[in-house]
Amino acid sequence: MSKEMEKKIQGIADKIAKEFKPEKIILFGSYAWGTPNEDSDVDLFVLKKDAPNPRELSGDIRGYLWSAKMAMDIVAYNQEILDKSLKKGNFFIRNIITKGKVLYER
């Protein structure tokens, strides 16, 4: 990933952190794994422990970042859903948590 793109992605994470105050933001997918191409989107996992409706939070974050004009996929979880997913052995979530790049942590 280029330094310019790295700065852009970190800036997006900083905006999310400031506006939504999550516990953690993790970059996953092709940008985190070092395999982006011209069609890649930015994949972000956002953990907000007390989010009553994580799906709604994902939509709110997407709306907030609309002006960034960048293809993004936002996956938001609260602590309860994260714990259940990890307990069930959800490979997708475990992969994000163990191999993703932490951009923000409170």
Please state what every model-predicted region is.
Residues 30:
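Conserved H-loop
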